[in-house]
């Protein structure tokens, strides 16, 4: 599993999470294609993931990066950590993330670490249960981050102050 990182001129941090070779068997033999899973973020709460498929690895990575830039979400962060502890699942992958105090660092494995780093989360405790398939872990992590809302946004939706809802 590769974990390459690149900073682009648009200010996005790009990470390659996984490259997978798949084979289609035909009458004349096997046809190999590659799939790439990438995550892109600005380090300030915007993050996206994408998958790309092609006959060559660089083309698959390029398609995945473009898909990730199109599929970006805004995550409400509390400084350099999460707002509150959250759970999410996708397929057989289950994830748990909780905020951590300053200086803790990103304690997460594999695909979750890549997403949290490009999103700009510097202090978090995270655990993946069940299947550790990177594609499902990325989906589950995104579900958890997408569902997270700051107290300010909840208060604004309800037309109340933050003190009234806490």
Curated annotation (Swiss-Prot):
PROSITE patterns: RIBOSOMAL_S5 (PS00585), S5_DSRBD (PS50881). GO terms for molecular function: rRNA binding; structural constituent of ribosome. GO terms for cellular component: small ribosomal subunit. InterPro entries: Ribosomal_Su5_D2-typ_SF, Ribosomal_uS5, Ribosomal_uS5_bac-type, Ribosomal_uS5_C, Ribosomal_uS5_N, Ribosomal_uS5_N_CS, Ribsml_uS5_D2-typ_fold_subgr. Coiled coil: none annotated. Disulfide bonds: none annotated. GO terms for biological process: translation. Residues 12-75 form the S5 DRBM domain. Keywords: Ribonucleoprotein, Ribosomal protein, RNA-binding, rRNA-binding. Transmembrane segments: none annotated. With S4 and S12 plays an important role in translational accuracy. NCBIfam families: rpsE_bact (TIGR01021). Belongs to the universal ribosomal protein uS5 family. Part of the 30S ribosomal subunit. Contacts proteins S4 and S8. This is Small ribosomal subunit protein uS5. It comes from Stutzerimonas stutzeri (strain A1501) (Pseudomonas stutzeri). The lineage of its organism: Bacteria, Pseudomonadati, Pseudomonadota, Gammaproteobacteria, Pseudomonadales.
């Amino acid at each position: 599993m590769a974990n390459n990182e690149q900073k682009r001129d648009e200010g996005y941090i790009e990470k390659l999470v996984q490259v997978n070779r798949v084979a289609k068997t035909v009458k004349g033999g096997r046809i190999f294609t590659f799939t790439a899973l990438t995550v892109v973020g600005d380090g300030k709460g915007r993050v996206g993931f994408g998958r790309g498929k092609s006959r060559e690895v660089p083309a698959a990575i390029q398609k995945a990066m473009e898909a990730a830039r199109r599929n970006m979400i805004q995550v409400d962060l509390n400084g350099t950590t999460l707002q509150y502890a959250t759970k999410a699942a996708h397929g057989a992958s289950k994830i748990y993330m909780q905020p951590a105090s300053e200086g803790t660092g990103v304690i997460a494995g594999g695909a979750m670490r890549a997403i949290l780093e490009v999103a700009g989360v510097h202090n978090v405790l995270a655990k993946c249960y069940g299947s550790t398939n990177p594609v499902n872990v990325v989906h589950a992590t995104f579900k958890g981050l997408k569902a997270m809302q700051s107290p300010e946004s909840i208060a604004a939706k309800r037309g109340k102050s933050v003190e009234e809802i806490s």
